């Protein structure tokens, strides 16, 4: 998204498809007309999404978190290098556990999440090459590649304000499955999918139900 970022062996290198998640999040936040949006970047990796949102939306405050110390260190380095330390905080923890005690419950305008989304079986098969340079934690997501999506979708309503939005990056062919997870939950409404230039659904989002 036009930013120069540090990367490291313990963090996923940002992919082009993640730019679609970032631009969709920024456009959605702008359309919500929130003066000073509060944003969570879940599974932040290098912090690329948190930094991009902070640069494009100067009034936003972002809480980024990841499970591994390697990712947290790289993300903090990128935040510091871009001079965003006053608006972007990076924490280590297991999903929303990293944000306990921050006072964010029912206050967050948007949660962006680029989670691992490759099944364990595929990582042992046709996607095994991904592990040559990047950590398993960046890719592995249970038997169907959706375990993190399911956990985040379940826990996000604790933090989203009514009308707030949860946005996921998804793997090829996962868009309908993730949209179905949203639609089967009573906590969400206005579910939609955003396709890339090839017509492939790579971002799925839903809004926290207002009533």
Annotated model-derived regions:
Residues 1-7:
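Conserved adenine-nucleotide phosphate-binding loops and their immediately adjacent elements
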Residues 4, 61, 87-89, 189-192:
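Conserved beta-strand segments of alpha/beta enzyme cores
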Residues 13, 20-125:
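Conserved SAM/SAH cofactor-binding pocket of Class I
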Residues 25, 53, 130, 152-156:
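Class I S-adenosylmethionine-dependent transferase superfamily signal
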Residues 58, 84, 135, 186-187:
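Proline-centered flexible-loop/turn and helix-kink motifs
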Residues 117, 207-210:
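C-terminal beta-strand of the catalytic ATP-binding
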Residues 117-148:
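Mobile active-site "lid"/loop adjacent to the S-adenosyl-L-methionine
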Residues 143-208:
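Conserved Class I SAM-dependent methyltransferase catalytic core
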């Amino acid at each position: 998204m036009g930013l120069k970022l540090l990367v490291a062996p313990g963090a996923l290198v940002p992919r082009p498809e993640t730019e679609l998640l970032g631009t969709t999040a920024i456009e959605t936040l702008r359309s919500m007309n929130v003066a000073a949006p509060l944003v969570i970047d879940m599974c932040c990796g290098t912090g690329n999404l948190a930094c991009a949102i902070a640069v494009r939306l100067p009034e936003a405050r972002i809480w980024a978190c990841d499970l591994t110390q390697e990712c947290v260190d790289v993300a903090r380095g990128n935040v510091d290098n871009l001079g965003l330390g006053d608006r972007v905080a990076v924490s280590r923890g297991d999903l929303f556990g990293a944000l306990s005690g921050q006072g964010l419950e029912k206050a967050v305008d948007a949660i962006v999440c680029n989670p691992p989304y490759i099944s364990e079986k595929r990582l042992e098969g046709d996607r095994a090459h991904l592990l040559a340079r990047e950590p398993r934690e960046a890719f592995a997501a249970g038997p169907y590649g959706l375990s993190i999506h399911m956990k985040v979708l379940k826990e996000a309503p604790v933090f989203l304000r009514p009308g707030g939005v949860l946005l996921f990056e998804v793997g090829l062919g996962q868009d309908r499955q993730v949209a179905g997870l949203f639609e089967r939950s009573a906590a969400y409404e206005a579910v939609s999918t955003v396709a890339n230039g090839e017509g492939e659904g790579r971002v799925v989002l839903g809004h926290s139900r207002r009533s």
